[in-house]
């Protein structure tokens, strides 16, 4: 009992604040930065913007505090029951003698929760139009290719090997982490970094690549900041994340999606040997076409020479004919002048003889009179013929003549004309007119 008393007297005494601070130091110094996986429960968001909740597993509970700046960086809604992995530091809160985890980063885990977040994020970005951009064509032979991936692992080796095998070109590697808390930010910064390079150093196409894995492993490629960076890129992007069955949001914002990293390299450059064969084929076609064209024009030149010789001969003949015609004209001109002078003298004599002029005019008047008389007689006969024809037609249409041919006109009691059985159905008295008279008929 005395020993217990002495031991009790030797025990160090602490104040409440001192022991609380000691516990705080013990927790923070021994655990440092940790990751904890669990299920969110009791979530509360204060007016200050800070979030308070418990992270639980079976019956164990860990209090968590997520300060407003950290909460603002989380791109998906927090819900009770959501499985998450939290990174942060352990500390104690002296106000109620409990330890808590101060959240620095929070990522979803568990397939159901992650798919829900993925679908909600996809719907949001799709509504903003980030998946409907005009795709930039992949250049045919890029002189520089940017590759964003992990510097370690098989992916970068496969891409380099495939490009060198198909068509060697300059490869610029921007190493990033392809998995983990800050991976999405690193890849987004790499895309922006390539776009901000000087034009002479800028790649013509960017490959964003990673090998296969679970949805948790590929989660960085669903980051909103990464999708926006891919959408805003002025350099075409080929996404090659996972295997053919794996789909991430960057696939929807990229300009082309490759099923594998190796396929991305094949999309980026053609096969050099195939290009050489194609060029050789085109060269043969060009040579054949050129040869045919030269032969065609050579034949045209031969034909043009023949035409030239023919035209020269034709022109010479025409020139000779023209010369001969000129000589003939010179020989005939004096005779022509003499003939015209004779006609002028004869015409002058006739003009001074009035009797000849009167006889000429009288003869001309006689001819005109005979022509006019004949024309008038022909016109008169034509009118008489038409008059006779119209008179005959008019007589044939006279209803008296029609009655003489056996027809009759039937009228009703009031003198109305009856032209059909229907109009005569209600009549009792009929007046029937023939060519030689009219009779009255009463219906029995």
Swiss-Prot record:
GO terms for cellular component: cytoplasm; exodeoxyribonuclease VII complex. InterPro entries: Exonuc_VII_L, Exonuc_VII_lsu_C, OB-fold_nuc-bd_dom. One of its GO terms (molecular function) is nucleic acid binding. It holds the Pfam family tRNA_anti_2. It comes from the Bacteria. The keyword Nuclease applies. It is an enzyme of class 3 (hydrolase). Keywords: Cytoplasm, Exonuclease, Hydrolase, Nuclease. Its EC number is 3.1.11.6. It catalyses: Exonucleolytic cleavage in either 5'- to 3'- or 3'- to 5'-direction to yield nucleoside 5'-phosphates. GO terms for biological process: DNA catabolic process. It is found in: Cytoplasm. Bidirectionally degrades single-stranded DNA into large acid-insoluble oligonucleotides, which are then degraded further into small acid-soluble oligonucleotides. Belongs to the XseA family. Heterooligomer composed of large and small subunits. NCBIfam families: xseA (TIGR00237). This is Exodeoxyribonuclease 7 large subunit. The lineage of its organism: Bacteria, Pseudomonadati, Pseudomonadota, Alphaproteobacteria, Rickettsiales.
